[in-house]
């Protein structure tokens, strides 16, 4: 009798494969998804995704911050009322995989703010010192479980990818906290459309 042992650290995917349920689950999802969803899923060709945790975020103007706390789950920043600031994430960047240079497809942010008076104004994306994407006046606040920003023309990445987030803290008697949980980038081999 051939006995399979499931060890600590085995992922759910591995457990499903071992039990044969992966095929059943895949078939069920395929049967339930509409043709347009299936077509969109087939079009997604992300070669690599890289994320960095929120507690690694760098603050450009620390003197404009009332308080800051790094924790295992996020960085919590309280801005001084009536100020703006820039927060920066250095994304671990694989520029070449298997002799092929990657392209930036989209950057993603996971964050929350305490109120509409603490908000993300701008999202800029850099390859080294070169600005490759600029999303201004996005004005996002409250819950943002996965805010995505396309990098136009999917440029080849030559150096390292950085995400700079322009934020603002208003003057209303409202909560001026922001929690950044993570930031990342989807990389692709696809040429621009």
Descriptions of predicted regions:
Residues 1-14, 25-28, 37-38:
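N-terminal secretory signal peptides
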Residues 30-57:
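C-terminal segment of N-terminal export signals and the immediately downstream linker at the start
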Residues 78-100:
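Short beta-strands within extracellular/lumenal beta-sheet-rich domains
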Residues 100-114:
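A short beta-strand element within beta-rich, extracytoplasmic domains
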Residues 118-129:
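Short, surface-exposed beta-strand/strand-loop-strand elements in extracellular ectodomains
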Residues 132-154:
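Extracellular carbohydrate recognition and processing domains
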Residues 153-174:
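Noncatalytic modules at the cell exterior or secretory-pathway interfaces
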Residues 168-193:
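Exposed low-complexity, polar/acidic, P/S/T/G-rich flexible segments that act as propeptides
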């Amino acid at each position: 009798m051939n006995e399979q042992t499931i060890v600590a650290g085995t992922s759910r995917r591995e457990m499903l494969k071992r039990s044969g349920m992966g095929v059943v689950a895949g078939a069920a999802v395929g049967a339930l998804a509409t043709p347009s969803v299936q077509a969109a899923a087939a079009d997604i060709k992300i070669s690599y995704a890289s994320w960095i945790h929120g507690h690694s975020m760098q603050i450009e103007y620390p003197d404009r911050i009332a308080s800051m706390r790094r924790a295992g789950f996020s960085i919590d920043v309280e801005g001084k009322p009536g100020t703006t600031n820039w927060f920066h994430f250095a994304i671990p960047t694989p520029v070449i995989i298997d002799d092929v240079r990657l392209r930036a497809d989209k950057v993603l942010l996971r964050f929350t703010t305490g109120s509409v008076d603490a908000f993300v104004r701008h999202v800029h994306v850099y390859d080294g010192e070169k600005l490759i994407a600029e999303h201004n006046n996005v004005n996002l606040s409250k819950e943002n479980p996965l805010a995505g920003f396309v990098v136009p023309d999917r440029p080849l990445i030559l150096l390292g990818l950085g995400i700079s987030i322009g934020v603002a803290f208003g003057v209303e008697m409202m909560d001026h906290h922001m929690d950044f949980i993570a930031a990342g980038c989807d990389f692709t081999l696809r040429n621009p459309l």
